[in-house]
Amino acid sequence: MDIRQVTETIAMIEEQNFDIRTITVGISLLDCIDTDINRAAEKVYQKITTKAKNLVAVGDEIAAELGIPIVNKRVSVTPISLIGAATDAKDYIPLAKALDRAAKEIGVDFIGGFSALVQKGYQKGDEILINSIPKALAETDKVCSSVNIGSTKTGINMTAVADMGRIIKETAQLSDMGAAKLVVFANAVEDNPFMAGAFHGVGEADVVINVGVSGPGVVKRALEKVRGESFDVVAETVKKTAFKITRIGQLVGQMASERLGVKFGIVDLSLAPTPAVGDSVARVLEEMGLETVGTHGTTAALALLNDQVKKGGVMACNQVGGLSGAFIPVSEDEGMIAAVQNGSLNLEKLEAMTAICSVGLDMIAIPEATPAETIAAMIADEAAIGVINQKTTAVRIIPKGKEGDMIEFGGLLGTAPVMKVNQASSAAFIARGGQIPAPIHSFKN
């Protein structure tokens, strides 16, 4: 490595907000299954506090050694609906509290996996878990929840979609932060290091470490140097920058894997913003020539960014996975917040952008008077984009306040303007229930 590359890396960290967003340890809880929920909860607590006890110390050690901030240390676990199903419990709050207690004991920021996979229907534990979500998120601090309601192979479980509209409303009513820790997916992935949607898939190894990087500020600075150049130059610039970012992510992942004695999983190639100025995906898109995000051309700019980040990342790391796409969470991106406030970015445009990025309607505040059926219909629209396009899509929306209010979440979750929602009813559509069948192009065997 020559001196120019060293100074480049220093600039990325000190001036351009580059960091490792998260190192996430995925832990299988299948060996914690027990017919008694309290015994299962104790086994869950013991396994997490044993397998991830050194995660925070190792993360801090690597950050100090390399001089690269590692912002979050997190844990993801096997979907809890699978663990709870063996019991006769009427709710899974004891398991949620065991997760929360374990997370606090080892000092991680969040723990994900209070989850259910219901893309083709409910099993015994699924419905119980889903109905436990509002109370579980209200009574814990670090637990995150996710529900997969559709996939390209199975279609969309519209009964679950309807239920999740109601659950999101109830969750927002019971706690200020609950809905910000709840994601509804189509085509959820098993190795996602990012919250709130992380869970540890049943096909994964017993314990795995996955890494998520963050570098929108680095990409923006690189694009500032090629203003006025053709899209060929823009694409090459993004690709080379993504290579550097991902290379560092892989290094951190491998170091953490060796020191913790666990398998290295993947680097997630997602560009994840924060509310800090200079750390915005929206500003990257504007640097390509858009006056403001949300105007015509936004989806095309996002497509270029997303694709070139993947191309550069795949060259840098032979194990990539997770969501691997640009995140466009409104509350967590100062450029997105500004675009909503100036009227150029609305829900409909964000839905269009979902066809490109990983998570579409993400960290969006909507009026608390929005009916549960309308929320369910938003989930159905996002799921349809994912199912038809064979990609992950998700919804994380917070029904709070009135249109035009500002909702403060604090920290990395930022601030969200309450956005306008279409007032026409979708109630009769959602009331049908049942399954939207899988698309014809999913039939490949």
UniProtKB/Swiss-Prot annotation:
InterPro entries named in the record: UPF0210
Transmembrane segments: none
Top-level division of the source organism's lineage: Bacteria
Subunit composition and interactions: Homodimer.
Family: Belongs to the UPF0210 family.
Name assigned to this protein: UPF0210 protein SGO_0390
Species in which this protein is naturally found: Streptococcus gordonii (strain Challis / ATCC 35105 / BCRC 15272 / CH1 / DL1 / V288)
